UniProtKB/Swiss-Prot annotation:
S-S bridge residues: none
Gene responsible for this protein: rlmE
Record's function text: Specifically methylates the uridine in position 2552 of 23S rRNA at the 2'-O position of the ribose in the fully assembled 50S ribosomal subunit.
Protein's UniProt name: Ribosomal RNA large subunit methyltransferase E
Chain residues that bind S-adenosyl-L-methionine: G52, W54, D72, D88, D112
Protein location: Cytoplasm
Primary localisation category: cytoplasm
Amino acid sequence: MKLLDARKDHYRKLAHEQGFRSRAAYKLKELNQSYRIIGPGFYVLDLGCAPGGWTQMAIKLAGNQGKVMGIDLSYVEEIPGAEILRGDIEDENVVDDVMNYFERKVNAVICDLSPKVSGNWSVDHAKQISLNYDCTKIMDKVLAHKGNAVFKVFDGEYSMEFRDYVKKKFARINLTKPKASRKQSSELYYVCLGFIG
């Protein structure tokens, strides 16, 4: 078995053993260990949350005093400790639902979303970046001053343009790829710290 396959299986097995819905939960855990995106008591919004691995990890990281909401267009099975909303992030009206639930601005916005992939790389990349722009429109209205955000990005033609756009909104931005990501995957994560609006 190749080392890569072994690693992939390791995270999948770990997720199964520890009750997480996807291996992606470990990406957030690793990112949080490096950058402390989510702390105890944080209010966290997970955009594009299906199947729920990041939402589950966010609950764990935010603890009992925290509050977590996940939003996705797809049906997501209920997650104890989180509010799940079936909604479209391309519809800015979801902001009202977010604010009604949290009753104040959130400390972190996390986005690990992917479009339904077509197999045409340039189309999928453009759509994924477009969804991230939609996330920033929501983020601008719900993220507290000095809050944090994470965006998964399919690396490609529009990645740097998106990075430059987001960079203006935060004190610091880091580009990283967690070990739990597949090595051959084009996904990167923009970790954005200290929201300045």
